[in-house]
Amino acid sequence: TTTVQYDPSEQYQPYPEQQEPFVQQQPPFVQQQQPFVQQQEPF
């Protein structure tokens, strides 16, 4: 296999970096749930 010729350590770095933004998109998802609870207060 010629896949061993490629540096797996360098190709693996960009992979985890793309996962960081994926986690940052989750915080806003939780903030959207807060307003949902405030709607019950006025109720």
From Swiss-Prot:
Start-end of Low complexity biased regions: 10-23
Q: Which domain of life is it from?
A: Eukaryota
User: What keywords sit in the KW lines?
Assistant: Allergen, Repeat, Seed storage protein, Storage protein, Vacuole
> Does Repeat show up as a keyword for this record?
yes
Q: Which GO terms describe its molecular function?
A: nutrient reservoir activity
Which windows of the sequence hold sequence repeats?
A: 21-26, 27-34, 35-40
Using the UniProt annotation, give all residue ranges assigned to the region (Disordered).
Answer: 1-23
Where it sits in the cell: the answer is: Vacuole, Aleurone grain
Residue segments, region 3 X 6 aa tandem repeats of P-F-V-Q-Q-Q: 21-40
Keyword Repeat among record annotations = yes
UniProt GO cellular component terms = aleurone grain; vacuole
Major subcellular location class? other
Can you state the subunit structure given in the record? Monomer.
What family is this protein classified in? Belongs to the gliadin/glutenin family.
Q: What does this protein do?
A: Seed storage protein. Serves as a source of nitrogen, carbon, and sulfur for the young developing seedling.
Instruction: Return the protein name.
Output: Avenin-F
